[in-house]
Swiss-Prot record:
Compositionally biased residues, Basic and acidic residues: 218-229
Ranges annotated as biased composition (Polar residues): 170-184, 248-267
Protein origin, superkingdom: Bacteria
This protein's name: Putative MgpC-like protein MPN_149
Region of interest (Disordered), ranges: 168-193, 215-267
Organism whose genome encodes this protein: Mycoplasma pneumoniae (strain ATCC 29342 / M129 / Subtype 1) (Mycoplasmoides pneumoniae)
Amino acid sequence: MAVGIFILSLNPSYELVDWKRVGDTKLVALVRSALVRVKFNDGTSSDSNNQDTNQNALSFDTQESQKALNGSQSGSSDTSGSNSQDFASYILIFQAAPRATWVFERKIKLELPYVKNESGAGDSTTTNSGSLYTTLQDLLVEQPVTPYTPNAGLARVNGAAQDTVHFGSGQESSWNSQRSQKVLKNNPGPKAVTGFKLDKGRAYRKLNEAWPVYEPLDSTKDGKGKDESSWNSSEKTTAESDAPLVGSTGSQMAAVTDSQQSGDNNGLVSLAQRSTTVAVQKSDSSGSQGQGTTDNKFQKYLNTTQALHQMGVIVPSLETWAGENKYWNRYPCCWWCFSPSSDPAIVFHKWRSTECNHPVIPYFNRPTRLLKWPDRCDGFERGTEFVVLGRGWANHVRKGYLMSPHRVELGHRQAEGVCGESAWFQWNQRHRLA
């Protein structure tokens, strides 16, 4: 991959982040500049002065980071060493060649730089160290016609290639018709960017649609998930009322981050379902969405933070959530130490396996962009450490799921092996704590 970066004349700071084989003939790689760093302000610090917690929540903490943002937004495609303004991230696509080699085919520039939380200038001076945003692991801003695009997965499910759906003679102007023919969700046109503009504004995700919904931040139509005409004052008011800003209280955050579903579907959907390919919420017996909280919030929308959790962008700490340490079990060997609160709590437990041969819970009932589920989660050696994710009441974990912690920490692009049981998770001799 270093050779590929050299050939493409990318800055020497570029590094390989992720890669994936696509069939036998394609190799897709994601590269980013190590100079691009990000820092967060979630509005919980004492000096926030009651400002809108969603304004300027994300900022780039180096000049190169800001250049990457400005360069990608300006549409500059010059990646030569002479132009240091461009530090955008790229999807690189390679074609298989004889003698087990890969030949560069094309690159796709991401709308915003791929960034991840790192220690850097300004990080040590922030007063909200250890807050929710410091747990951000990955930020992948997607664009159409990449293996990471939601519609790519939906199109494949329905037997159509992504480029066939998005592009072709007259298809851009007849997007609604094409979308309907391929039985895709109510997604925006082919030019819309599918990532959040995290550095400003407020964004929402509609629960019954597979694509994020954005509040338009300027006069442009493309690039906000919905055309401006579709985001009227009525929808904005409804979204703001249904998905209020979260940050004033940790307990409120805890109550809404894992959207409560009716029935027995109480797994960590926001953590386990790390794909925007399929984002259909389970319905209850009456046919409603079955979403929301006891105060009737988050019935139709998720705000920026919750939407990012659903998309798998923000990966919570394996020990804490929203900074409310007292509510979370930090002792892997103490399975009875759950939240004293009567409200459901998200709990994390370390578990060292004696065996891992349970049927895999089918979180995804169709192909997803980078997840391939085995029939059984064989292949993990005895003693492999897992993390149990589930809701906790009193002395048990309901609908516990097992996930290798190094997979969890890397986020949705790497989450390949999930073990679980279809019934209530019971601790017994076979399931031993570390």
